[in-house]
Amino acid sequence: STKEWIASVGCDIFGGGISALGWKEGEMDLVWDRSVSKADGNQLTLDAPLTMALDNKWGTVKVLRYSWPGRIAEAGLENLTLASDYDKKYPKDEDHCWTGVSIENAENCWVRRVNFKHFAGSAVIVQRTGSKTTVEDCVSTEPVSEIGGMRRSTFYTMGQQTLFQRCYSKQGIHDFSAGFCAAGPNAFVQCDSEESLGFSGSIDSWACGLLFDVVNIDGHDLVFKNLGQDKNGAGWNT
């Protein structure tokens, strides 16, 4: 992410001539986790598409070979109810569990048919090191928290090649969302929310390859736009 590219998308300065919240060189790099299925000279065929155009005009791309001993794979969670125990005297109590399931340092994993209740943060969050994850037929209701900040990002990915399908959320803030520079592709398919308190979509900067297909959001919007100074200078969210 070069200075020239950042300026070309209008995210170096968010008004007033003040650049403190603007994107900085090298901070918006995307890192795709792929397998090379074929190599022919200087041409590589990958196992999954990349989510933005590569143009030498705006900088260079590196291909790095790596190994990951101990990376979690082929693991799943299904047919459960997970509920966070909160202080019933405080309807917006936050001194209790925030996250139902967090997927990190893992690939080819799944969460299926899980019922989540009362979590303040996320029912399911796929961290930046999560790839090839499926979350399906899950329900999140009755979250307990204040309204604001990074709360109630119900089904949330910062990773790549994530599929959320047939998931339901009630009273979330960002019911179906992607995070900062989520490399993608990430998809939300046949998902529904009710009484949404905030928008769905990317909630931070430049989450690429984001698909919403047959998603109903009751009470708020699906947002693909330049968020400007919001979220500490998010700029284009996708």
Where are the regions that the model predicts?
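Extreme N-terminal leader/anchor segments
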Residues: 3-7
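Right-handed parallel beta-helix
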Residues: 73-84, 107-118, 130-145, 158-174, ...
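Small/polar beta-strand repeat architecture
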Residues: 13-94, 98
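Beta-strand-enriched cores of mature, soluble protein domains
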Residues: 8, 19-20, 216
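Short, charged/polar low-complexity linear motifs in solvent-exposed/disordered segments
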Residues: 12, 63-64, 129, 143
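Residue-level marker of regulatory loop/turn positions in helix-turn-helix DNA-binding domains and
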Residues: 25-28, 69, 95, 103, ...
